[in-house]
Design a protein with these regions (language model features):
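Short acidic low-complexity segments
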Residues: 37-49
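A short, hydrophobic beta-strand-centered structural micro-motif
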Residues: 48-63
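Charged, amphipathic alpha-helical segments and their flanking helix caps
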Residues: 1-37, 59-192
Length: 192
């Protein structure tokens, strides 16, 4: 836990982005190194690569304000409150993108998913990755080229988190893109 950490929101956002980058870039060994792009905001159109995951912070604020703002967590008294933050997670896949998932459920080795099948696979694995984030444990191995910063580990005490159902799942014919959107929110202890 980090007291007087005025950077909680950036720490949380970076941790989500890095955990997704680590998952997608290490899944099935080096076959997928740098295949899936994970962005912290929508990139400029000319910089957009596929497949991509775009994490957008859409809101934050006090979840529960304490009387007098003095709170006791674990026997120690601090100034603070419970604070919430919300993100929208977007998946974008163009019609030509493929991703090597390894061995498919049908037994195919080096199976390459694309279009709707890739979208379904990414929705499930993003959900699994995000809900499995251990906010208190440092990541032990990081692929080269990722921006992961171990100082972000163990600096946020998450009270609860919620990943809501994927929506707007489908195909956009004008761009020939597949996509889906989900909302993720979490509540953490904001010590000051």
């Amino acid at each position: 836990m980090a007291v007087n950490n005025s950077d909680y929101l950036n720490v949380i956002e970076r941790k989500i982005i890095d955990e997704l980058r680590i998952f997608f870039n290490t899944h099935h060994s080096s076959a997928n190194n740098d295949v899936v792009k994970v962005y912290g905001q929508f990139p400029e159109p000319e910089e957009l690569k596929f497949p991509s995951v775009v994490i957008e912070q859409v809101g934050s604020g006090f979840e529960q304000k304490m009387m007098g703002e003095k709170v006791t967590f674990g026997g120690t008294t601090y100034t603070g409150e419970l604070y919430g933050v919300a993100f929208v997670i977007n998946i974008l896949i163009d019609k030509d993108t493929e991703y090597n998932i390894g061995t498919s459920p049908q037994g195919t080795t080096n199976a390459k998913y694309k279009q709707r099948r890739l979208l379904n696979w990414m929705m499930l694995n993003i959900a699994n990755t995000i809900t499995s984030i251990d906010w208190a444990t440092a990541v032990s191995s990081v692929p080269a080229g990722l921006s992961y910063n171990p100082r972000y580990d163990a600096s946020v005490e998450v009270v609860e988190s919620h990943l809501r159902a994927w929506r707007d799942v489908g195909y956009l014919p004008a761009f020939q893109w597949y996509g889906a959107t989900a909302e993720f929110s979490l509540i953490f202890k904001n010590y000051r």
